[in-house]
Amino acid sequence: MDIMRSVVGMVVLLAIAFLLSVNKKSISLRTVGAALLLQIAIGGIMLYFPPGKWAVEQAALGVHKVMSYSDAGSAFIFGSLVGPKMDVLFDGAGFIFAFRVLPAIIFVTALISLLYYIGVMGLLIRILGSIFQKALNISKIESFVAVTTIFLGQNEIPAIVKPFIDRMNRNELFTAICSGMASIAGSMMIGYAGMGVPIDYLLAASLMAIPGGILFARIPSPATEPSQVTFENLSFSETPPKSFIEAAASGAMTGLKIAAGVATVVMAFVAIIALINGIIGGIGGWFGFANASLESIFGYVLAPLAWIMGVDWSDANLAGSLIGQKLAINEFVAYLSFSPYLQTGGTLEVKTIAIISFALCGFANFGSIGVVVGAFSAISPKRAPEIAQLGLRALAAATLSNLMSA
């Protein structure tokens, strides 16, 4: 019965994606079928093949270690605002967006610029880009972006595609945005595991997001034009840097533009969502529902979908509410709310814990639209209107990808 319900849930998710498609006749059944089978196969390997799980876990730890070096630069500028003392200064609110996330964007962008300069990024694109290119019938740049989401998040993807963004067609751009939203960065995985979320679920969900992001990008936005992206004479900037130092400096300045764009738009989006919640709560108060909010509405709306995915009806409202928190706020807050249910002696079944853990594992939320618009617009202002148009549909597609992994 549970298996049948899960199969029905998969069909429902695919049907929703089909309804969102802008060109239903151009959907490639080969790409969709191969991506779906690959998503299922990766889930099985990660959960039941220990060497595969160990390899990805070590890679995630390595990325986390590299990302941690950005704290050295941040600490030099911000002093004790960054580091272990953050918990003391901010009464436990250690995850400070301005002092952790934004400096990391600058550091990673500078590092990527260096990797382009010495030729490493070109080599990675050719190798990683070929992995899924033929199997899924997609372009090399789409495959490369999808694979790198295991290690880097949506904040860093604009830096990766900067040399190509003006040549990427609309479908490739949509796939890049969707892949970023459907995944979580390897560095974030460690933090969520620290909240009690089983690391094997996080690792499996992270890898399943590669074909999942492609699957749910290619149904709403099928490929209708050939790729114009080439990989000769790769350079991170319009004028190729002449030295190691120039490459790092130009990358850092680009990172600053991306960080500023992300911070500006995210502030606006979070404030707008708070305003919407205030309006909903105010109206709800007239009818005795003063605590009504976007996430609570999503909780009720998504409860039936959670049940179809395999959650018992008694826990469906909780699952829907957590997914609603992820959509309306972010996955960090949702996992924080989920954490008490993961403690020893919890009331949730193992199956329910697994489904919720997978469903929350991704950056797909309304704030991410702001991140995407701000970051991509910073590196390609002329494509900003197009990126803004794709944001909401990419959010829907990435959310469906997360739910399919569950």
Where are these regions (language model features)?
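Structural signature of hydrophobic alpha-helical transmembrane segments
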Residues: 1-11, 100, 292-293, 356-365
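Hydrophobic core segments of alpha-helical transmembrane domains in multi-pass membrane transport
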Residues: 10-20, 35-47, 105-114, 183-191, ...
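Interfacial/capping segments of alpha-helical transmembrane domains
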Residues: 45-81, 230, 276-301, 314-322
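Hydrophobic alpha-helical hairpins/lids featuring a short glycine-rich hinge
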Residues: 68-138
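Juxtamembrane inter-helical linkers in multi-pass membrane proteins
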Residues: 126-160, 226-247, 292-298, 322, ...
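Alpha-helical membrane segments and immediately flanking helix-loop junctions
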Residues: 135-194, 320-405
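Long, contiguous bundles of hydrophobic transmembrane helices that form the permeation core
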Residues: 207-258
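Transmembrane helical segments that form the transport core of multi-pass membrane transport proteins
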Residues: 253-344
